[in-house]
């Protein structure tokens, strides 16, 4: 309906982490016994944040954790029908599954003008694997291609960086 009235539509998925007080989840940034409640998505990181003692940053463990976060869902794992989108892929609650589900919903609703594949995930985008590579950036590029295959060439696809990501990573 919005596009029919001449408005341009941007779909901006938002991660809200439902982590409550006293959660017993170790804080990967500080080592505290509990993670902050309802934290900002920019805090998503490795089991121990880069710079922390024992962090897997810069190693193959970082690549494995980033891969697990993104998951292995594919656009073909979804079946849009009527007013729903069924999923038949790997049994995972992953980032790819989240974004690809929304891409299919947008397509089923008549598409959008622009689609963000993520926003303000600096704790993920700054993770390094071996040889100074950034595995989350590679994952986001692959995800953008998959979203493109669902939404088509006319939809603008991007990532909404946090202000601290604009200038690149300077550890």
Please state what every model-predicted region is:
Residues 165-171:
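Distinct, well-ordered alpha-helical segments
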Residues 1-132, 155-164:
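Substrate-binding cleft and catalytic face of glycoside hydrolase catalytic domains
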Residues 132-158:
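Active-site neighborhood of glycoside hydrolase catalytic domains
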